């Protein structure tokens, strides 16, 4: 059984909890998620089953879409609503919609972000939240992220909050973004609510819940919930090959580029009759060759 489960992660579960449940439901240890969501966050969490686990890093690398609420007036140690309040300031002059939109525009593009102390980012083999809980200070790594879209969706002036929609690269901490937006507006702030509505090609409307999975398991139809692996690689270039080339690709052979053949965008996918065969990329030392990164065994023509 191979494929991608477009899970809607509920609040209260860690991403690892979701993986463990899916291992039980699908009776396999080959299960992996494609981007951590905090326990208090709900949203799209594609789960890779069987051979689909080979594409986890490629699916993790896709754009993410979030909806978040920025709460002005106080900040917390965790940068979300679960942490202890560390700074407060009366919101005496709530920003106008125009001011909010102007500030949001300044965050669009490539930028650098320092991850929050209460996060799973590792420094010297230890997670940042472990340092935070032990009250130890450590230099946090600066990471490059990209905000593709950042829009204002609604305003609640009475409660000093507003909602935003974010399209961003992997590794973006929305909590930190909310704090930085607050600073730009002149107020301490935190993220009071977050939902991930899309990861790569998987959106909220296509997801399944644990209740749906349990019902499918009881009917022995859980495999129907899985999307084919190719659906998780829609962001990569796909090249259709013939039967002879299929055999060479499935054997994991390095391939020569034909004369005058344009180079593909790295990485790219070889497919045959709708099935993903392998993911290839340019050879690091031979510009006239391409090499396999992942090869998929075609057992039942459902990958």
Curated annotation (Swiss-Prot):
Biological process per Gene Ontology, one example term: tRNA pseudouridine synthesis
GO molecular function terms noted in the UniProt entry: RNA binding; tRNA pseudouridine(55) synthase activity
EC supergroup of this enzyme: isomerase
Name of the protein this chain belongs to: tRNA pseudouridine synthase B
Region forming the signal peptide: none
Enzyme nomenclature, EC number: 5.4.99.25
Manganese among keywords: no
Protein's job: Responsible for synthesis of pseudouridine from uracil-55 in the psi GC loop of transfer RNAs.
Record key words, sorted: Isomerase, tRNA processing
Family: Belongs to the pseudouridine synthase TruB family. Type 1 subfamily.
Matches recorded under Gene3D superfamilies: Pseudouridine synthase
Active-site residues, record numbering mapped to chain: 38 (nucleophile)
Listed CDD domains: PseudoU_synth_EcTruB
NCBIfam families: TruB (TIGR00431)
SUPFAM superfamilies: Pseudouridine synthase (SSF55120)
Reactions catalysed, as given in the entry: uridine(55) in tRNA = pseudouridine(55) in tRNA
